[in-house]
Every structure is written in structure tokens, then in C-alpha cells.
């Protein structure tokens, strides 16, 4: 990254309308409480439509029936998505039983959706059930605060089931960072939990009155697993251990995957190394990164507002020096670390504490009772007897964690009886999609509903070329916002229009390289034809242990993205 021509620390100009909305919202209250009582519409009006995002919700509608309802002169079938705050993806079995019941009784779709940010979402919550869902979460010690919009989102933590002590320490830091960076406004408690209004002035010492310029994502990662995809995130703490004990973190800043089709001022970017810090400085450094982005991030153009753009504009050394100044530290040199993979190890793994951990593959993270595979019922039955916890992974899977030897057989029987341990090939285990249609308002093409059958066809290509047990990290995202993390895949499909995608190639298995667009706006037959040819070449020409993405770069099929701000669109 060039340091020769750093830009201004603050972007001058007319602020975006989102900044007006936040300023006028009275610390995120708006008129949400009044809007809740408006029975004339199933949605939220005006600024409240956006303000509810700070409370963990998005207003959506069923796009499959949107045109039909419009023809009948009806408003869209409004319903909310709610995303829980769940640092590190850890959820107790008591909490699981509560969310299972709510999904069954109070949502249109009856499902629980595990996300690749280690939490769960409810889709299809009608307006009348919005307040009850927040109260249900509160009753079991959960909330949805700051899981959307311009705040520090759900903090991820490697779902490492092997080194229990290290995971426990890293998870505690993920929780501490999450709590430290939460908004201080009482709006959430007043609106959803009926807590009394206190006659004090709200203050936001870290986030400020207008919060952050854009969404902000944080991870705690334990090498050698990069399961949380650190390069998709603004701020990353890479755990450094000595003798199995956590001693500090390497800090990487400025990753992010969202782009806009055709807008060359937007690009996906991997995170940059800042340095090493001892544990005692973790919260001060986290706060310093967030407040620097708060003050320097672009508030005039939301498409250019994320930390990755701030870092490129002001220069890495300038941003790093400001973080050091605010935190009162000097970063030490980066300590050695290495990533070897991103996938979850499906099946049983024994931890060093002699407890067992069962990782269940959940295709696309969608937990529902399917014909012949009652996944939702199976997990409920396991939750009723399991003494440990569940962990949601960043690959949208679920770990039944800390199972004693005496419970192992019983839990396995329940899992098998409910279709939770059906064997799948490595390719399916390493494929992922965002939700997209029918609920996401931004979706341009199918993703979750498209991926299973598309994976069948890719598996057939692998079989045809004699490598049925190989895998390629493959991801589909329904729009360029990139929730499916296709911009860190070996094969990335980015929705362009119904049935059409941009095909990106050249990422790698460990998730440290951005893939480049190979073909634009193509349909499934063209995608499969390209993959058939390239996978055939990979099978014949690859070097020992060479992944598909690395092969496409070495063979000159695609040029690697080396400096995204300058060469992503070339």
C-alpha cells in the first residue's frame, strides 16, 4: 500500500442523510415506540425503518409474493429479521430451547438461521411479535443490541474445540471486547424491555452521538484455524500463545469485502498488520481503533465509509500512529503466526480436557424440520439432555460442545436419528451462501436456495475428473454487499441479476487472498462450463497439495489481486 500521497484525515462535504438521521434520533430512540402501536401498517415508517437496525432488526418482505400483493393493492408482507448478539457463537442449551420455541410459535418461516458471523437470525417476525422477541431474549440473558448498522457488530471467535483452555481465554476476550464497545444509550432497554426512562443525559464516550460512519466488524482468531475469515473484518486480534496460554494478540486492521457493481471506488480488501500487543492493552487498543475510525471515517459517502477506505486514504502508518497515541502504547513487531485452513472438522473431536465436541454440518445454516430430516427437533432433543453448550461456527455449522464420555453415545444416536449426521462430501462442507431471496431486500440473485443443487453439479465435475474427495472453497452471495464472503473464496459467485452471477477466481484455501473477477454476468451453464474446464486442468496439472485457487494463479488463468485499492478492478 502506498504511503506517498496520504489524503485528508477528515473528508469534508455534505454529510449523508444517515448522519442526519442518527443525530436527530435522540440516541437511537426515534419514534420506534410510537410506531409499534401503529396497526395500519406491518412495517416501520420514515427514519424508524433504519433505526430499528441499531436494535438488531431489518425490515424485509417476502419477495416471492411482492408482485402478487401489489396487484391486489396490498402493501408488501412486511416482517422483521432479528439477529442476536452472541459473541463467539456460544449459546447455552436453555437459551437454545427458548429460541427454538419462539421460532416455532412466532415466526412466519419457523426456522432458525445460523449465520457466518456466529449467531442466529429469526426471519419473518411480524410487527406484533417484535417486542416479545426482545423480551424473550432478555429473559434468557441474550439481546440483539448492535448486531446491525453503524456499530461494532457481533464479535467472532475461533470455534476451536481442541485447545479448550486457549479457546476459553480467547472467548472471554471476545466477550469483553463486545461489552466494551456496546452503545451506552438506554433506548434499547426503554423501548423493548419497558425499563423506566432515567432523567439523565445519554452519552456515548466511545461511539459518539452519531455512532460510527459505517458497520464495524471484529474478530478474535486462534491460529492455525482462520475459520472466522479475519480478512473480512475491520479489526482482528490474532491470539499468540506461549505454552498453551494466551499472552497477547497480533492486531490486523482494515479488512472488508463489500463492493458495488461497477463502482471502482469500492473494492474488497484484506486486513493489514499493525503489530503485537500484550493482553493488558487489548481493550484500550480496540477502543483506539474504533474511535480513530469514528473520527476519520468518511461520513459524506456511505459506500466509501468503512475502515478499509479510511486506512487507504490516510495511510497505514498514519492510522497506526494515531491508534498508538490514543491507546498510549507502541506496537511490538508482529509475532509469528500461520493459518492452515478455514473449514470445520465435522464429526467428533476430543478436546484436551477429555470432553468430546461434535461438529454438525448444517447446510446453509438453515435449521428446520425437513421431510425425513427433522433437524430442528433433533437439536431441541439434544438441548434437553446436553449438560454443556452449543457453539455456532463462522461456517454456519453447530458444535455440541463439552460432551462427557457418558453422554456421547446418546447424543450421537439423537443426531443420527434426526438426520444431523448424514454423510456429505468435502465439497459441500466447504460451500456457503448468504440468505438472499426471498427475504433479503438487497438480493439480486438466488444464493441459499441455489447453492445445494449447484453443489451437486460441482461435485459431479470433481467426480468426472477423478477427484471426488477433493474440495474447493466455494461461496455464493446474492449481491455485492458480500454477506456470503465470496470475496475470500477460491470460487466466488456474486449475484448480478436473477440467474446471473459474476464469477471470481484466485482466492486461496486459508482466506488470505481476494479473488479476481474471471467472467461477468453469466448464467449457471456458463459457470459450470468454465469450472469443468478449469477443474479438469487442476486435476491433471496441479502440484502436490496445491489448492484450486493457488493453481489458477500459478497457471496464469487469473492474475492475483495484490493491492486491492489499485488492482482489484484491473
From Swiss-Prot:
| The enzyme's E.C. designation | 1.8.1.2
The pathway where this protein functions is: Sulfur metabolism; hydrogen sulfide biosynthesis; hydrogen sulfide from sulfite (NADPH route): step 1/1
Instruction: Please give a single GO biological process term from the UniProt record.
Output: cysteine biosynthetic process
Q: What PANTHER family is this protein classified in?
A: SULFITE REDUCTASE [NADPH] SUBUNIT BETA, SULFITE REDUCTASE [NADPH] SUBUNIT BETA-RELATED
Cofactor(s) for this protein? siroheme; [4Fe-4S] cluster
- One Pfam family per UniProt: NIR_SIR
Please name the source species.
Salmonella typhimurium (strain LT2 / SGSC1412 / ATCC 700720)
Encoding gene per record: cysI
Binding-site residues for siroheme, renumbered to this chain: 483
Picking any one GO molecular function of the record gives:
heme binding
Could you tell me which Gene3D superfamilies the record lists for this protein?
A: Sulfite Reductase Hemoprotein, domain 1
Q: Could you tell me which InterPro entries the record lists for this protein?
A: CysI, NiRdtase/SiRdtase_haem-b_fer, Nit/Sulf_reduc_fer-like_dom_sf, NO2/SO3_Rdtase_4Fe4S_dom, NO2/SO3_Rdtase_4Fe4S_prot, NO2/SO3_Rdtase_4Fe4S_sf, NO2/SO3_Rdtase_FeS/sirohaem_BS
The family assignment reads: Belongs to the nitrite and sulfite reductase 4Fe-4S domain family.
Task: Using the UniProt record, name the top-level EC class of this enzyme in a single word.
Answer: oxidoreductase
| Subunit description | Alpha(8)-beta(8). The alpha component is a flavoprotein, the beta component is a hemoprotein.
Protein name stated in the entry: Sulfite reductase [NADPH] hemoprotein beta-component
In terms of NCBIfam families, this protein maps to: CysI, PRK13504.1
GO cellular component, alphabetical, reads: sulfite reductase complex (NADPH)
Q: Which reaction does it catalyse?
A: hydrogen sulfide + 3 NADP(+) + 3 H2O = sulfite + 3 NADPH + 4 H(+)
Q: Where does the source fall among the domains of life?
A: Bacteria
Q: Which UniProt keywords apply?
A: 4Fe-4S, Amino-acid biosynthesis, Cysteine biosynthesis, Heme, Iron, Iron-sulfur, Metal-binding, NADP, Oxidoreductase
